[in-house]
Regions:
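Glycine-rich phosphate- or other oxyanion-binding loops that anchor nucleotides, phosphorylated ligands
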Residues: 1-162
Length: 162
């Protein structure tokens, strides 16, 4: 197991480091997310990642699209692994989301898109499961801290079932 740290840069670096050192062909990401769509304490498998904070719309690009990066799409799709979990679209950004994101998604995190992009570039399968800690609202920072330990326990149980 490896801890990526918080944010897209930390996640991208750790994913690259782990893949380079281990030569793995699949990376399993277990983390937390906020959602106004899914219930708190629910496990959700991410089947698509988008960037909720990439905004170069002033230059004519859609929100979520990285300019001059035609090789990799704004949305990165993942093949589901866990048949018994709800599936969701995760908007990743380097901010703690407390409002409605500008891109279509039903959960939010701070690392997933970066992991997905590194995995896609290196031809590594990514499986990502998020524990919903909060409602991605004004109380999110309080709920996240309160629910972090519960999430770790539930994610560990899922990991041990594999």
């Amino acid at each position: 197991m490896h801890y990526s740290g918080i944010g897209k840069v930390n996640a991208a670096f750790k994913a690259f480091e782990v893949i380079q050192k281990t030569g793995c062909t699949t990376l399993l990401n277990l983390g937390t997310a906020g959602s106004s769509h899914f219930q708190a304490h629910e496990l959700v498998e991410v089947t698509r990642f988008v960037q909720r904070d990439m905004d170069v719309s002033a230059l004519g690009f859609e929100v979520g699209v990285t300019p001059m990066d035609q090789e990799y799409p704004a949305a990165i799709d993942l093949v589901p692994y866990f048949k018994h979990l709800s599936q969701g679209i995760c908007g990743t950004g380097d901010s703690f989301e407390t409002a409605t994101p500008k891109v279509a998604c039903n959960l939010v995190d701070m690392e997933g898109y970066a992991l997905a992009k590194v995995c896609k570039k290196l031809n590594v399968r990514l499986i990502s499961v998020k524990y919903i800690t909060d409602g991605a609202d004004g109380a999110a920072h309080l709920d996240w801290q309160e629910n972090l330990l519960l999430g770790a326990q539930k994610l560990l149980k899922l990991y041990q079932s594999i």
